[in-house]
Every structure is written in C-alpha cells, then in structure tokens.
Amino acid sequence: MAKLLKDNYDRAYLRRLAAEIAKAEPAFPQQKMLKFIFDSAWEQKELKQRMRHIAQGLQRFLPQDYGTALKSLKQAAPQFGGFEAMFFPDFVEVYGLEDWDLSISALEHFTRYSSSEFAVRPFIVQDQKRMLRQLKSWATSKNEHVRRLASEGSRPRLPWAMALPEFKKDPSPVLPILEKLKADPSEYVRRSVANHLNDISKDHPELVTHLAKQWISGKPETRWIVKHGCRTLLKQGHPGVLALFGYYEPQDLEVQQFQLTPKKVAWSGEVQFEFELVSQASPLGQIRVEYAIDFVRQKGVTSRKVFKLSEGDCAASSKSYRSRYSFKPITTRKYYPGLHRLTILVNGQEMAAREFHLLSETDSAG
C-alpha cells in the first residue's frame, strides 16, 4: 500500500524542521516543539489538520513578534519543498492577516519552495481589490512558482481550499491574469491556467466557450490550455466546444456488435465491453469516442461519469474498441449495488447503451 502523504510528517521530518528553525533561532526549544506536535491526537489527524497543527506549534515556540518569527521561517523554508512544506504559508494564513505587507512578502517567498495557493485565499476574501493588484503583479514575476500562484491562488474551485464565492459568481476580475499567463513558457503555470479555466467552465460555460474561441488560434501552448481547460465541457458534450476541436454531430455512424459482460457484476469485480464503430460513408473522420456509466447512488438516484476511449482523425471506415471498468474500492468514489447503465458516446452524442447489475457484497459472496 502506498504511503499516505500525511505520513511524510514523521519524526525524522519534524526533527529536521526543528533543527533548521534552531539554526535561525538558537533559543528555539526543539524538544518541546516535537512533544507538542506528537500529542495524543496526532495519529487521528488528517493531512491538512497535521499541517495546521505544525503551524500552531511553530507559532507557540517561535518569538511572539510576527515579523521576527517570519525571518526564522523564511531562512528555514528553502530546505523543505513540495506539498508537505505548505505549513510555512499556513502559518501566514493563520497569524498574518493583520500584517499585510509582511505576509504578502512571506507568501511570495514560501511559494517558491512549496505553494501558497491555500494561504493566499483569506487575503483575497479580506481585500479583493488590493489582492487582485498583487496577483497581477505576481503574474509578471520571473519565477514560475510565483506566476503560478497568481492563477492557482485565485481559482474559484481549488480542491481542498477555501472557496472564493465572488469569483464563482463573476470571474471577470481574474481574466486579465489568465490572459497574461495563457502562453507562459512554463508548463507548470500553463497547467494551472487550464485548471482555472476548467473551474470557471463549471459555472460559466458560455464565457469559457467564448474565451476558447479567442485563444484557440494562438500558440500551441495556448491551444493545449484551451483543450485541457475545456475538458469538463467536452465530457458534457457541449456542442460549441466540441465543434471548436472539429467534433461535429456524427453522420452515418453506427455502433455495431456491442457486447457487455457480465450482466451481473460481482462486488469489486469489473465489467468488460467491446464494440465496433462503423461509417456508412467512409472515413470515420474526426471522432471523440467515450463511454459513460450512470452509477447508482444513495436512494436510487444515478450520477453519470464520462471516460474517454480515443479521439482524433480516423481515416478508416470502421474501428474496434475494447475496454473494461473495475469496481474495486477507491477513495474518490463510493459504489452502490443496483442497475447501472453504460453508454457509448461519439462526439458527445449517445449512440448505444447496455445495462448491468452491480451485485452487493453479500450477494457476491453467496
């Protein structure tokens, strides 16, 4: 089993953190800090709870003057990186909202080694206009991590993060930031812009469609942003976005020899399916082929999830497909027994469907 991210905060990691802090602040009580962190509730804490607990421990044992504490943290931060080091900006989020200048400088510093994407959001909520000016400034930074923060920190639907309801309602204030970054030389930054665009598409599909039409003829890097940023709209079969990439309503196409087995899928088992896509007027042309499963949820309702099989220009008049879906338990999806439906989609249009039952764990055992 893969190591959980929260378990990276082990004793060796925290001892190293305490030692680095002590280099900047010789009076820092390393053992007291470690005892505080590894308290009786530590094992029950999840990732972000552990992150916050570490930030609280730092605040408790560093000098109580905020600026002095930040100096020590800034000195130690370059020795730590990745998601785990986000307790540095978390310290700013919790204790620095009333000291704007010191805090914004610290967030810019810390994001170079981890990311301040969570910590910057309370500052946006507190003073949106002021923070927008800062975000626009960050978008012009020479450092790719700082430029990414301008986009990632202002995403309206950033996972695990504080929501930004004003940007959900009206994303127009952040569009100039995305415009600045739409052809950024860093893939790290471009991926953030694409994810930001995808966030916006969930509340403002027509706005993103309009932007996509404007951006699609730009540099190859920008075209990638458009494609990745429109992924939700593509899965939803949005006609305007599909057409933008050359995927039009299929004409003279048929799904043939569609087979799905088994009809009764054991708990933790898998469903397999195959079919042939045939054109009556060859070639198949520009096609995006997907399948959707209508999953049973609580109280008998269903929820659809779309999965891509292939896309591109096909010169042949027919093409065979074979795939499977596993119902092995995963943390991001909970399964319920009952009648499911698997549908073949071509360019967003439903072409054929089959039903199958997912058996309960009890029925599967019997």
Q: What annotation goes with each model-predicted range?
A:
Residues E311, Q349-G366:
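Short beta-strand elements
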Residues L253-Q256, R297-E311:
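Short beta-strand and strand-turn-strand segments in soluble, beta-rich domains
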Residues E270-V278, S282-Q298:
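Beta-strand-rich binding/interaction modules
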Residues P329-T331, L345-R354:
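Short acidic/polar inter-strand loop motif in beta-rich domains
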Residues M1-V241, L253, A266-G269, E274:
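Surface-facing alpha-helical segments and adjacent helix-coil boundary elements at the starts of domains
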Residues Q259-A266:
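Short beta-strand segments of immunoglobulin-like
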Residues P329-L339:
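Short glycine/proline/serine/threonine-rich loop/turn segments at secondary-structure transition edges
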Residues F273, R304-I330, L358:
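A beta-strand/beta-hairpin structural motif
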